[in-house]
Regions:
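PAPS-dependent sulfotransferase catalytic domain
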Residues: 33-80, 87-202, 263
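PAPS-dependent sulfotransferase catalytic core
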Residues: 1-54, 60-65, 98, 148-149, 163, 198-300
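General alpha-helical segment detector with a strong preference for membrane-spanning helices
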Residues: 10-12, 88, 242
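Short, well-ordered alpha-helices that flank and scaffold nucleotide-derived cofactor binding pockets
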Residues: 14-18, 190, 247
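A detector of helix-start/N-cap boundary segments at the beginnings of structured domains
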Residues: 1-3, 174-175, 228-229
């Protein structure tokens, strides 16, 4: 299971920890959280570790797609969840600055070196004045997780988009939508019952729901309509990928007789053709893997 920042991965990992004890499988959660791109040797080492681990088990990490067959290995079962790109970006923007409901000082733990002027930078200023954090290539975030380790996967454009779509079709058992998480969990329970049996009932448990509220990012504000439209334009390829995955997910749901019971989505944004984008280094995911506190509370 790849973990994409601010796409519900902490909720999923908490569920997996409960399920691993209930069903007797191993859960391996990597303690490396800010290295999604690997050298060839690092890829080979990680593939070796995953391929030789004691089964049955699930492995989770923030890492871009790895092609096991390229190194002579058997391709594993890939699972992932993505989210509306603008909502993901806004959640990450404020999470880096102010954390979540676990405590007022949570943001100080996560970004202790952040300057005050950066921490309190108005989101509209960041977007409208084209600050690096609110511009490409840093907004090109979701697609590289599916495109893979090739350098061109970090360049916003059609090549990375099409390669990401191809990998979704050929290498992923399921790519779900966070906005429809209950249906994602229901499909996982059908596809992989040894791992996910009863996951939906656990997720709906009032105690779990109460804990889930603690991971909600605080102090989020909504950008102006002008700023939102600019984000849509800058995230053109992210949205093309998001809607492609969403359509594939809905096809899968219909195949298994699931009906959507979700709020009406916002209309698709209208995009203009952007000017060529320079390739720079996107920021790494700064979300720390800190779910142990959730697990401990749940077991009290």
């Amino acid at each position: 299971i790849q973990r994409i920042g601010k796409c519900g991965s902490r909720t999923v990992v908490l569920l997996l920890r409960i399920l691993s004890e209930k069903h007797g499988f191993n859960l391996v959660t990597s303690d490396i959280h800010n290295k999604t791109r690997l050298t060839k040797n690092e890829q080979m080492e990680l593939i070796k570790n995953i391929s030789t681990a004691e089964q049955p088990y699930l492995f989770t990490r923030h890492v871009h797609f790895l092609n096991f067959s390229r190194f002579g290995g058997d391709q594993p079962v890939y699972i992932n969840i993505i989210r509306d790109p603008v909502n993901r970006f806004l959640s990450n923007y404020f999470f880096r600055r102010f954390g979540d409901w676990r405590g007022e000082q949570n943001h100080m733990i996560r970004t202790p070196s952040m300057r005050q002027e950066e921490r309190y930078l108005d989101i509209n200023v960041c977007i409208l004045e084209n600050y690096p954090e609110c511009s490409n290539p840093r907004l090109f975030y979701i697609i590289p997780y599916f495109c893979g380790q090739h350098p061109r996967c970090r360049e916003p454009g059609e090549w990375a988009l099409e390669r990401a779509k191809l990998n979704v079709n050929e290498n992923f058992l399921l790519v779900g939508i966070l906005e429809e998480l209950e249906d994602v969990l229901l499909l996982l329970e059908r596809f992989l019952p040894h791992y996910f049996k009863d996951v939906l009932s656990i997720y709906k448990n009032p105690e779990h729901r109460k804990l889930g509220n603690l991971t909600v990012t605080v102090k989020k504000t909504v950008p102006s309509p002008e700023a939102i439209q600019i984000l849509y334009q800058r995230m053109r390829y992210e949205y093309e990928f998001y809607y492609y995955v969403k359509e594939q997910f809905h096809l899968l749901k219909r195949k298994f007789g699931l009906k959507s019971h979700i709020r009406k989505p916002r209309p698709r944004p209208e995009f203009f053709i952007p000017s060529p984008l320079e390739t720079e280094e996107p920021i790494d995911d700064e979300e720390e893997d800190d779910e142990k506190w959730l697990e401990d509370i749940y077991k009290r």
